[in-house]
């Protein structure tokens, strides 16, 4: 019998205060919301797999770096406390950095790839080949689109590059959902029968909000494609979830993410 994931631990690694039209194309420009910045821990054969890594704290806490990288007053990152969000969140779940055996990033935006510094020289990092190529292409365009080379241009990182859909661990499949960025990937997670079965589809930034999914509304951020292409990816994920009977999780929803966190804490209570 095919093995699956035995436990899922959602992490909240910060928040972003931003205009709604960052997440929904064509939303009223004066509408705003505070979105969570998630990470997901998956207990797989061999150890924990981490999906996404949150912010690079130094780019927020250092005043000079903050002006350099987060100077837009309309889009502001928020940290959960004075420490390092990722190690602190892992510790809160009773997990150390050394317990993480692999990392996968949905894409290289600063709120997803900023914590890769914790894993350089330690574990493999899964990414789509076209995403990494775009991020390493040089020139000003990637940074204008929220991809900061300082987060991931480290020769110590061991990349595992995929060309399209790929199984990255038993029960975890990366699904290419390009549009938001050139190599964005979402994740289909199959839960092992011993842990209750079923599963989830984590859209990541292919669909920020429940409104993107239910209304098939284009996301507000996209690179080198028309906004309608992001709706194609939303429909693809909806079909995948429906075929499997899985719950489709939006990437930054301020209601859906806390609800999932609560639901999974009930299903898999934290260790005492």
Predicted regions and their residues:
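Active-site gating loops and adjacent loop-to-helix segments of metal-dependent hydrolytic enzymes
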Residues: 61-80, 209-223, 265-272
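Short Gly/Pro-enriched turn/cap motifs at secondary-structure boundaries
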Residues: 29-33, 175-180
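Short, electropositive alpha-helical surface patch
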Residues: 105-107, 184, 257-272
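Active-site metal-binding loops of divalent metal-dependent hydrolases
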Residues: 53-56, 108, 130-131, 180-181, ...
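Metallo-beta-lactamase
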Residues: 78-111, 118, 124, 128-176, 182-261, ...
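Conserved beta-strand hairpin/beta-sheet module of binuclear metal-dependent hydrolase folds
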Residues: 15-88, 186-205
């Amino acid at each position: 019998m095919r093995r699956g994931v035995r436990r899922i631990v959602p992490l909240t690694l910060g928040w972003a205060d931003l205009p709604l039209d960052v997440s929904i194309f064509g939303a009223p420009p004066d509408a705003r919301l505070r979105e969570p910045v998630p990470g997901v821990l998956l207990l797989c054969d061999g150890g924990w797999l981490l999906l996404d890594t949150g912010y690079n704290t130094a780019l927020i806490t250092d005043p000079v770096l903050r002006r350099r990288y987060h100077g837009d007053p309309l889009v502001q990152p928020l940290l959960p406390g004075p420490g390092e969000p990722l190690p602190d969140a892992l510790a809160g779940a009773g997990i150390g950095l050394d317990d993480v055996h692999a990392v996968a990033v949905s894409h290289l935006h600063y709120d997803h790839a900023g914590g890769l510094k914790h894993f350089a020289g330690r574990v493999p990092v899964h990414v789509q080949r076209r995403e990494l190529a775009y991020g390493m292409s040089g020139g000003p365009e990637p940074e204008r689109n929220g991809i900061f080379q300082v987060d991931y241009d480290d020769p110590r990182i061991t990349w595992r590059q995929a060309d399209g859909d790929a199984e990255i661990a038993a029960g975890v499949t990366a699904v290419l959902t390009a549009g938001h960025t050139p190599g964005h990937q979402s994740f289909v997670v199959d839960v092992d029968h011993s842990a209750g079965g079923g599963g989830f589809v984590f859209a990541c930034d292919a669909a920020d909000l429940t409104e993107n999914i239910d209304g098939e509304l284009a996301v507000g951020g996209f690179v080198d494609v028309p906004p309608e292409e992001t709706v194609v990816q939303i429909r693809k994920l909806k079909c995948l979830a429906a075929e499997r009977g899985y719950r489709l999780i939006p990437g930054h929803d301020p209601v859906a993410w806390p609800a999932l966190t609560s639901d999974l804490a009930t299903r898999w209570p934290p260790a005492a």
